[in-house]
Amino acid sequence: RPVQPKHFDQYWQAGILSWDSGIEMNLHGPYYAELLGNRRERNRSLAKMEASMQAGKIINARHLVYHVGPYGEYDPGTEANEQVANIFSGIVDRVRSIWGEQDEDAYTAFPWISEQEPSLVGIETSGRQELWGTVEEVLEVCNHVEGTVPVLNLGHIHARGHGSMRTSEDYAELFDMVRETYGGSKFYCHFAGIEHRMGNALHYTQIKKSDLKFEPFAEFLAEEGDWMDITIISDSPLLEHDAMYMMQHYDKARQRLMEIRARDERRIKLAKESGLTPEELELLEQEVAEAKTREEKEDSKSPAVTAKAPSKMMSFDSPEDDDDLF
């Protein structure tokens, strides 16, 4: 049965604001779910998800993000993935039917209904070994269910991989795998610092306190992200602070990349003017830098000349009156 979301007015106002200002809205469903549980547990989870599906229409959510929950009686593998695919196929159908329930008044209240597609259903990667949701599992289900998209929670992936996301190459490998398996250039991600142990996420933390650093991700985005249409959601306890922190580090990474490219362009130009190849000019610059380093080391090894301390002499001068110093 339909579940009327609470605080309807606030949801609707948020939808109108996002529509008028061009801000993309996304909505996260219940954080706890048991979609692989028995019928009672599954239906209870779906009933809670129903309210978020209706709220998604009211706020014009572009993505509705859901967790699957524990494996339950299933073992990781094909059977569990098929069950998840069947469940999410029904969820996609329900979302589309909610968006299709409309009348003439709805076009005025919800102008996006006639111009936007229904919300996409996001399936989020999990951060614990007992929960369904490895990257491979999520990609397999999304490939089989139209209307679903993978949600890459990078903190969860890092934790489940025993701290696997440490360099820009790690991110390149992950996104290349997603592109080859799922296709497309649109990506939806969550990012936050995370505490983890033995392949299990414990809790989110601010990015500065985590071994999951944003700088390598920013470096990857700056160098290879031109082909990507990516949305990054801050999951940090310091929500706005770490969102700005990520934006600043991405801007810094872009600036560094521009400086490197400008330097390389100058080197190529100088090489052409000098009649050298860029490689020969770079080798010459390295030799000059090494020679300068050797000179600095030799200068530091030479004995320093110390000034002779003045001999202490007995003075009979009376001390000056310092009362007028301040």
Which residues does each PLM region occupy?
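Well-ordered, non-membrane alpha-helical segments in soluble/globular domains
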Residues: 5-11, 49, 81-89, 168-175, ...
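Gly/Pro-rich active-site loop or hairpin
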Residues: 75-78, 132-135, 158-229
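Short amphipathic alpha-helices and their capping/turn segments at secondary-structure boundaries
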Residues: 5-21, 50-57, 134-146, 169-185
